[in-house]
């Protein structure tokens, strides 16, 4: 069963959940970004997703990425061509600033497009997700010279980006990082090992730009001594052409439960003298810089939770309309399971929760846009990110499980394909910060820091919506209003 972008549901979120004209006006783009343009963007993204990207999803899960004897990595069939199609269509340029060749599209719009990519093939779309995050980080923290060299090729889709944090002894505890960076003239020599590096090596782009956390020799202990470095796979000549291979290599790929089409690499830095890296910002300020990229990635992972749930729902709905099981009284032929009450319950639950997930994601995208234009709005956006990442990813586990349940015994058989979505979803509450990390972030960083002002404002907004719906003529709406009122106290 092929994927079709839920364009009507996306239009509903943009028109009735988020004030799209208000957002575009706030960021000074009301004249250049019209509703008709946004509609056309979503339609064209849907065509590319259905016709090209989604066709690679099953093969990616079955064949997976493969490391070759020379250390190169071959991605599944169709992945490289699909990424080329994205680049040629200008889709890799959506988020970047115009000065770097980007389109500076509002986040509330680009997040809808990213949902489409992630639904069509989550393992494939991870490459674009991390590249977007690195572009965002470099736009904020890199020097003008670094920006000029590294951002435009990623915007064009010729290069891709990664985020290198984790080491065997340093997962959530980044204070345990041991990768070293020793200054040498205008650059640093990087030595160490990084693990769980998504698209750390692949064949979809000319170059890979790694953003690496490391320590200088005299760095303070703990997280206060972490710096961040740009380490390209191939060094870049003064004219922008690619030079010699840098001293960073893929030594193995992880064998995973899900997202098997994405190469998750173990990278070795400095086996032949040290990889050349370039300091971003100041020494010992790396974690602050990387958090900018991580927040972008956490929002994007929340979108993945929505996306995989949507894909699983579509497949479950198709199966329920197609599968005949049981014969109603008075009929000789069987009936499709869409008429079974419990199947209807499962599908209705999935649809309603996915609608809520998309609404929350749209609110988050709009909040990020407003924060980009007005620093006073940053607290609201920051508050929503751990909520989006935590709730959307946790619910994706339940919703993809329900999609398997709709299939009955066939859901447990890999040939149907529905199990892939269940397996793919399992990583989402883990990477880019576990759900427990999101909870800590929400309480200790996002709530306590302003003495609960942002959270109180959000709860008051929810209470106001509930109050406006109290006593509504529609009994379902009235019950929802009562539940909202109870939830916010």
Enumerate the predicted regions with their spans.
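Internal maturation/activation junctions in enzymes
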Residues: 130-131, 142-179, 183-186, 193, ...
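A glycine-rich, basic-preceded beta-loop-alpha segment at the flavin cofactor/substrate interface
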Residues: 196-198, 235-251, 256, 263-297, ...
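Conserved catalytic-core motifs characterized by acidic clusters
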Residues: 24-27, 199, 278-293, 322-341, ...
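Amphipathic, small/basic residue-rich leader segments at the start of a protein or domain
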Residues: 1-125, 149
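A short core secondary-structure module
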Residues: 187, 191-245
């Amino acid at each position: 069963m092929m994927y079709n972008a839920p364009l009507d549901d996306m239009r509903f979120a943009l028109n009735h959940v988020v004030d799209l004209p208000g957002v575009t006006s706030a960021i000074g783009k009301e004249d250049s970004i019209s509703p008709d343009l946004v509609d056309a963007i979503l339609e064209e993204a849907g065509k590319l997703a259905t016709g090209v990207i989604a066709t690679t999803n099953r093969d990616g899960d079955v064949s997976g990425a493969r490391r070759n004897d020379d250390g190169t990595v071959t991605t599944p069939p169709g992945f490289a061509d699909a990424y080329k199609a994205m680049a040629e269509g200008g889709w890799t340029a959506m988020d970047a600033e115009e000065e770097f060749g980007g389109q500076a599209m509002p986040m509330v719009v680009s997040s809808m497009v990213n949902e489409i990519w992630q639904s069509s093939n989550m393992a494939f779309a991870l490459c674009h997700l991390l590249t977007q995050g690195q572009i965002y980080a470099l736009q904020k923290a890199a020097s003008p010279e670094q920006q000029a060299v590294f951002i435009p090729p990623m915007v064009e889709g010729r290069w891709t980006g990664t985020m290198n944090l984790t080491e065997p002894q340093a997962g959530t505890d980044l204070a345990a990082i041991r990768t070293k960076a020793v200054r040498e003239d205008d650059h640093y020599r990087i030595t160490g090992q990084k693990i769980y590096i998504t698209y750390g090596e692949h064949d979809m782009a000319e170059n890979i730009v790694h953003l690496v956390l490391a320590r200088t020799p005299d760095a303070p202990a703990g997280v206060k001594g972490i710096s961040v470095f740009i380490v390209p796979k191939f060094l870049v000549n003064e004219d922008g052409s690619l030079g010699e291979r840098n001293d960073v290599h893929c030594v193995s790929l992880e064998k995973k439960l899900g997202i098997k089409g994405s190469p998750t690499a173990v990278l070795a830095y400095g086996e032949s003298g040290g990889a050349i890296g370039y300091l971003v910002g100041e020494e010992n300020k790396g974690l602050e810089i990387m958090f900018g990229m991580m927040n972008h990635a956490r929002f994007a992972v929340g979108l993945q939770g929505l996306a995989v749930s949507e894909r699983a729902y579509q497949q479950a709905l198709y199966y329920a309309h197609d599968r005949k099981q049981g014969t109603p009284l008075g009929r000789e032929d069987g009936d499709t399971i869409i008429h079974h009450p419990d199947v209807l319950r499962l599908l209705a639950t999935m649809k309603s929760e996915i609608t809520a997930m998309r609404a929350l994601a749209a609110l988050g995208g709009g909040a990020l846009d407003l924060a980009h234009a007005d620093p006073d709005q940053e607290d609201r956006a920051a508050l929503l990110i751990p909520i989006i990442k935590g709730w959307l990813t946790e619910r994706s586990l339940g919703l993809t499980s329900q999609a398997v349940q709709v299939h009955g015994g066939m859901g447990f058989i890999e040939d149907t394909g529905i199990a892939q979505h269940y397996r793919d979803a399992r990583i989402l509450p883990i990477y880019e910060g576990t759900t427990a990390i999101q909870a800590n972030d929400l309480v200790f960083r996002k709530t306590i820091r302003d003495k609960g002002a942002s959270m109180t404002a959000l709860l008051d907004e929810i209470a106001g919506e509930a109050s406006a719906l109290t006593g509504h003529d529609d009994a379902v709406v009235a019950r929802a209003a009562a539940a909202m009122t109870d939830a916010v106290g």
